[in-house]
From Swiss-Prot:
GO terms for molecular function: hydrolase activity. It comes from Rhizobium johnstonii (strain DSM 114642 / LMG 32736 / 3841) (Rhizobium leguminosarum bv. viciae). Its EC number is 3.5.1.84. This is Biuret amidohydrolase. Strongly inhibited by the sulfhydryl-modifying reagents N-ethylmaleimide and iodoacetamide. Inhibited by the substrate analog N-carbamoyl aspartic acid. The active site is at D36, K142, C175. Changing D36 to A/E/N/Q: Loss of activity. The keyword Nucleotidyltransferase does not apply.
Length: 233
């Protein structure tokens, strides 16, 4: 995929439209959001592993995200990381969410190989070393699927004057999709990098990507790590 440049406008080749829609792609107005790349979601002994899913599906995005992260760090783009987890006293954990997790054998707050499952401050809750934030990068701790719900993400984006959001992380069909929809409804121009996302079910991953593209890009556009790195101004 090639970059397209028109009179100081920059586009990433994407489907169903070159992104961003207006070509206003700059380090000062664009943020990379890396969603929930935590041991609990993609590491041995974590929440997803405890539920018996194939870890290779949620580990596949690690290397592509590393390449995107390195490129965007080098060019001075805003970097934001998210972590899903709950307070140690579980005061922010809905009863039905805990019930569902216990029902499938991985109760949130219960002891696990990486500490209490999806609990803030535990080893499994933290971001994996390969993608760990560096000084100056924002970390958003969230109690739910969406990165805007019960967090200060919107305030951070407004303070940084962000217009464009590039979404990566896991899982495509749950936390990434929810965050993309939340951002789109708030007027942010969104791009999903399909090889930088993963899900516990590959069919769900593909379905989530397909839904982004419907109706001319109802939630934004879709590209990949190679196209982004090649065209990034």
């Amino acid at each position: 995929m090639d970059a397209m440049v028109e009179t100081n406008r920059h586009f990433i080749d994407a489907d169903p439209y070159p992104w961003p829609y207006n070509g206003a792609l700059r380090p000062d107005n664009t943020a990379l959001i890396i969603i929930d790349m935590q041991t609990d979601f993609c590491g041995k002994g974590g929440y997803v592993d405890h539920m018996g899913y194939d870890l290779s599906l949620v580990q596949a995005p690690i290397e592509p995200i590393k390449r995107v992260l390195a490129a965007m760090r080098a060019k001075g783009y805003h970097i934001i990381h998210t972590r899903e987890g709950h307070r140690p006293d579980l005061a922010d954990l809905p009863a039905n969410k805990r019930w569902r997790s216990q029902r499938i054998g991985a109760g949130i707050g219960d002891p696990g190989p990486c500490g209490r499952i999806l609990t803030r401050g535990e080893p499994g809750w933290d971001i994996i070393p390969e993608l760990y934030p560096i000084e100056g990068e924002t970390i958003i701790d969230k109690p739910g699927k969406g990165s805007f719900c019960a967090t200060d993400l919107e305030l951070v984006l407004n303070q940084k004057r962000i217009e464009n959001i590039i979404l990566t992380g896991i899982t495509t069909d749950v936390c990434v999709s929810t965050t993309m929809r939340e951002a789109n409804d708030r007027g942010y121009e969104c791009l999903l990098l399909e090889d930088c996302c993963g899900a516990t079910d590959y069919g769900n991953h593909l379905a989530a990507i397909k839904m982004v593209k419907m109706q001319g890009g109802v939630f934004g556009s879709v590209s990949n790590s190679a196209a982004l790195v090649e065209a990034l101004p």
